[in-house]
Amino acid sequence: DQNLILLDGIPVYNADHLLGVFSIFTPEAMKRVTLYKGAFPARFGSRLSSVVDIRTNDGDMKQYHGTASLGLLTSKTHLEGPIWKDRTAFNVSVRRTYLDWLARPFLDKDKKYGYYFYDVNAKVNHKFSDRSRFFLSFYKGKDHCDYTRNTAYEYDYASYYYNDGMDLNWGNTIAAARWNYVFNHQLFFQATMAYNHYDMKMSTGYQNLDKVHQEEALYVYDSDYHSGIHDYSVQADFDYTPHPAHHLKLGTSYLYHVFQPEVMIS
């Protein structure tokens, strides 16, 4: 928890899929990555370990281009280009795994297991003038894991039927608006408003149906566990260069945390 990972300046609470096998960042959507292993600037806060600062692609204002790839486990597509040539550009990247589809034909009909994840990156970049730019960026990623098991036992004197299952989801949602303005060759200003949400939900259920001597008894157990974080933030930064040998960074920020732990059992 002492490693800070930023996507366009916004903290990312969960940066991987499949317990660390895949990163949530698709290369086509990224512009640059800066790693601070230590002695990082004060603007990154009070984390004790490292900082990974990731910036997404702004989009091409001149022409359209993109890529599409089909892999053994995942497929992804990327497209960028102008909305208004030389003024507004977009960048969109989508990725999804299909482990759930590939495994389905090989599973027992009474036992169903599934896992998938997806990522969506989108960004719009508008140029008001040579001095002023506005950016809208969005990220949505999710992991989903589930299983269902049905078991039946038949005896001369009784019949038992068991059904249990689990549904687990976790992921990030990030939305940000940023405005850059160049006052002159010495002073640069940047304002950012952002919303960041991490959510984890797990639901489990168990059902037992017994038939003994024509009498029916039903037992049901359900539980829901939810852990969520909502961040609302506003930030303003100034870069001032009074002399080629001096560079001053000033800024202020406000961050409002909302924590949502929840347990429901019935």
Regions found by a protein language model. Give the residues of each.
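Extracytoplasmic loops and strand-loop junctions of Gram-negative outer membrane beta-barrel proteins
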Residues: A15-D16, L35-Y36, G59-K62, R104-D108, ...
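Transmembrane beta-strands of outer-membrane beta-barrel pores
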Residues: T56, L72-T74, I83-K85, R96-D100, ...
